[in-house]
């Protein structure tokens, strides 16, 4: 068995190391596998932030919904409000983010979200996490 990601017809990987560019990342692919396209997009976003900043603050949180929605417009509105506040509060010009809507049927609809900011301007996540709760 190699340590490279194996991709099947469903564009899922089942190995424990995800190879992206020249780097390998340890991942928990689990029994259901890893969605390759979103993983690549996330790593591209992290690398873009690191190419502009020597340190990046990554804040990861879940956004839970009370009821099902047929689209993701709520994330667009959330981003607009959060980014406006973050730019005003911290004076950052570049904000990285990734999100993924959970597809499980047994649980309530929710989003996994990661916000990436210049760590030379944002030292602690407390104010941001409070604002996330307020906006959501």
Identify the meaning behind each predicted range.
Residues 30-37, 73, 77, 127:
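Alpha-helix boundary/N-cap detector
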Residues 83-88, 106-109, 126, 130-133:
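Catalytic core of pol beta-like nucleotidyltransferases
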Residues 116-136:
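Helical (often loop-to-helix) elements that flank the catalytic cores of nucleotide-handling enzymes
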Residues 44-103:
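Signature for HUH/AEP ssDNA processing cores
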Residues 68-70, 106, 121-123:
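Eukaryotic short linear interaction motifs
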Residues 21-22, 95, 132:
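Acidic, low-complexity intrinsically disordered regions
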């Amino acid at each position: 068995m190699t340590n490279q990601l194996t991709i099947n017809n469903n564009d899922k990987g089942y190995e424990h190391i995800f190879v992206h560019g020249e780097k390998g990342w340890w991942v928990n692919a689990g029994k259901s596998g890893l969605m390759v396209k979103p993983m690549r997009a996330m790593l591209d976003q992290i690398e873009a932030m690191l190419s502009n900043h020597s340190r990046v603050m990554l804040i990861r949180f879940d956004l839970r919904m009370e009821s099902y929605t047929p689209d993701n417009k709520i994330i667009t509105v959330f981003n607009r409000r959060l980014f406006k506040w973050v730019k005003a509060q911290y004076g950052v010009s570049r904000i990285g983010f990734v999100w993924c809507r959970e597809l499980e049927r047994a649980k309530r609809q929710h989003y996994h979200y990661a916000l990436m900011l210049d760590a030379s301007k944002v030292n602690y996540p407390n104010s941001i996490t409070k604002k996330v709760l307020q906006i959501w």
